[in-house]
């Protein structure tokens, strides 16, 4: 609130946020931003949208995200596909970076086709002022994501979200049973569970490699007062045996001299 004033152009927040928590005040945040004339930009993990509210429902003006969870390999950080969406408002659409493709029909109406739309934004018309200058070609990844989404459908996306919630909540249950301080942060979460250990999170992460486990994220890298807190991520592919292997490894590491 103290940093939000009439000079604020936009406010960006993520849901779930960096600590893996689901923001529960999204409506209030959006309302306060709009009351000051600021745009609301929301970063999302698209795999969550099968079970969480879409940003449009709480007033997001712009939504961004990474398409990697939608059927793409991590590829050590890239290349991947970005997601960029706005409200259906001409003022936003005309300022979007990249090319816009719209669906249409053939002249006789028998076939569906796709073409560039709002071409007054394009380089062959606006030259150096074209907003489509700001783009890269990620068509191959966009195609893979389209196939993934078409294969999954709304029900499939919902089921994946539910499976991730189930896996992460099972992991939380096991952390508690093994007497770890978890969750370290209070609040609802999606697929990431915060855990405090006796050893530093950096040491935990390093030693887990010996057990063929990558994780969790040492939050001490970002926050000085969280040197013993890790963020463990769980997805739809993790099994109960995977989670048990993690518990076994953590107990051995914590008990080692």
Give the role of each language-model region.
Residues 155-245:
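Conserved C-terminal alpha-helix-loop-beta "cap" of PLP-dependent enzymes
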Residues 1-113, 179-180, 202-208, 220, ...:
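Conserved PLP-enzyme active-site core in the AAT-like
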Residues 41-43, 61-65, 112-113, 120-121, ...:
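A short linear-motif detector with a strong N-terminal bias
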Residues 70-178, 183-186:
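Active-site C-terminal subdomain of aminotransferase-like
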Residues 16-22, 41-42, 53, 68-72, ...:
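Hydrophobic alpha-helical scaffolding
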Residues 1-3, 17-19, 29, 33, ...:
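Structured alpha-helical segments in the cores of large, soluble enzyme domains
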């Amino acid at each position: 609130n103290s940093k939000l004033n009439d000079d604020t152009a936009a406010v960006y927040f993520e849901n779930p946020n960096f600590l893996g928590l689901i923001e529960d005040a999204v409506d209030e945040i959006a309302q306060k931003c709009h009351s000051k004339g600021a745009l609301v930009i929301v970063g999302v993990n698209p795999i969550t949208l099968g079970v969480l509210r879409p940003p449009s429902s709480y007033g997001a003006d712009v939504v961004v995200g990474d398409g990697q969870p939608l059927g793409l390999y991590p590829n050590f950080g890239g290349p991947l596909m970005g997601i960029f969406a706005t409200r259906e408002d001409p003022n936003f659409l005309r300022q979007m970076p990249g090319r816009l493709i719209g669906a249409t029909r053939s002249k006789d109406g028998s076939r569906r086709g796709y073409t560039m739309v709002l071409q007054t934004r394009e380089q062959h018309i606006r030259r150096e002022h074209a907003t489509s200058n700001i783009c890269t070609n990620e068509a191959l990844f966009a195609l893979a994501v389209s196939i993934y989404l078409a294969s999954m459908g709304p029900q499939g996306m919902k089921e994946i979200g539910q499976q991730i919630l189930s896996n992460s909540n099972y992991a939380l249950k096991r952390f508690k049973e093994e007497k770890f301080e978890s969750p370290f942060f209070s609040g609802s979460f999606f697929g990431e569970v915060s855990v405090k250990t006796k050893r530093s999170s950096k040491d935990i992460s390093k030693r887990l490699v010996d057990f063929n486990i990558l994780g969790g994220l040492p939050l001490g890298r970002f926050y000085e007062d969280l040197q013993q807190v890790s963020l463990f991520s769980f997805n739809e592919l993790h099994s109960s045996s995977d989670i048990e292997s993690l518990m076994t490894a953590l107990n051995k590491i914590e008990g080692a001299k």
